[in-house]
Curated annotation (Swiss-Prot):
Record family assignment: Belongs to the ligand-gated ion channel (TC 1.A.9) family. Acetylcholine receptor (TC 1.A.9.1) subfamily. Gamma/CHRNG sub-subfamily.
Encoding gene, per UniProt annotation: CHRNG
Protein name, entry field: Acetylcholine receptor subunit gamma
Known partners and oligomeric status: Pentamer of two alpha chains, and one each of the beta, delta, and gamma chains.
Residues glycosylated per entry: 85
Amino acid sequence: MVLTLLLIICLALEVRSENEEGRLIEKLLGDYDKRIIPAKTLDHIIDVTLKLTLTNLISLNEKEEALTTNVWIEIQWNDYRLSWNTSEYEGIDLVRIPSELLWLPDVVLENNVDGQFEVAYYANVLVYNDGSMYWLPPAIYRSTCPIAVTYFPFDWQNCSLVFRSQTYNAHEVNLQLSAEEGEAVEWIHIDPEDFTENGEWTIRHRPAKKNYNWQLTKDDTDFQEIIFFLIIQRKPLFYIINIIAPCVLISSLVVLVYFLPAQAGGQKCTLSISVLLAQTIFLFLIAQKVPETSLNVPLIGKYLIFVMFVSMLIVMNCVIVLNVSLRTPNTHSLSEKIKHLFLGFLPKYLGMQLEPSEETPEKPQPRRRSSFGIMIKAEEYILKKPRSELMFEEQKDRHGLKRVNKMTSDIDIGTTVDLYKDLANFAPEIKSCVEACNFIAKSTKEQNDSGSENENWVLIGKVIDKACFWIALLLFSIGTLAIFLTGHFNQVPEFPFPGDPRKYVP
């Protein structure tokens, strides 16, 4: 019985309370016109305070230069028409009224990119008995954010959210930053429990300030604005693993062409051009990520262009080395200055030990010379003489010649005289045989000399190849370090505004 009585009393009080709140709302909205600004006089200015709470930095689209954020925007103002005496309504000092029924300061995001100026959801407005209005609607904003691509992917960006009154000027509405404990909240508020960390960007500074456009007058709606800044720094680990590291490793392969023989110019060019094509693909991937701007070139783009230039130089070097290595005495003459420079001077500083073949006669290197060239020379000589004069075996038998080492000791004087007569008669044939032998010996010597000079050209090609290897290695290493260290030293400033020693943090 007692419980039933208590339940009836509670229900009666709740119904009475609901009736009182309903009566209050009916009284407040009875003669209320939401189209009229709540100004007591013509010169009365409505103070509108703003506070931005960031819950999620969703993304930054570099290609479209658009920042997407999830925020709660806190707007406060005073509407004298919505005030009441709490004693007349059983102590009710707060009511919740749908925002569609009230006058709202039309504060919108000015620098949006999708045409959505308004909030995502029109929540109820908290109305206090003194006329104070508190509105906290959620919003997902896509605002413009000019991208500085110079140090991509070691960059930081300065994005902003600009809020203005769409129709009211400074004589009617005064935009201000929210205040707590008598101090302006000059920063974007972040609740650590509700904030979701972004995997690509880190928030370094989040100041807020009111800005005046002194080129205009207070009669212009663009004269005053509230700007919330987001200075964010990129986390480069993703790009280091997926773009920079593969690019550096592939680009370093171009230096390996110098470990191939100097005469393997075709294989060297093939490897260099393959690396060049791979770098072109990486450059295409970078172009798909950064905005299409001609103001700056991204850091990774500079590096790719640099290594492409180095690869092109290496291809040119391979062609030059191949041209030098295949030179012969018939096409090029090897001067003593060139021989001294490339076979005597440079090898000392390149760590090479070369000994030109003609400069070391005391230690002749074993050669494997083909007899085919000698046979060709002999045939050339045979073609110059009648065949009958060179067939010594038949002439020996036909004229009664005998080998001296087979002659016995019983040769008489007459035989000796006949022998001298026969030798005198056959002197031209013997002379021709000697000339043939001399011709073959001369041809063999010329072939050996030609082979020695060919070998010197090959050695010169090796020296050029080794010198270009060290040049390419130094150029590649220094260029890589210089370019990426430039990005490493691109740090976010300690203070958000130059010349202002405040960090704008709570």
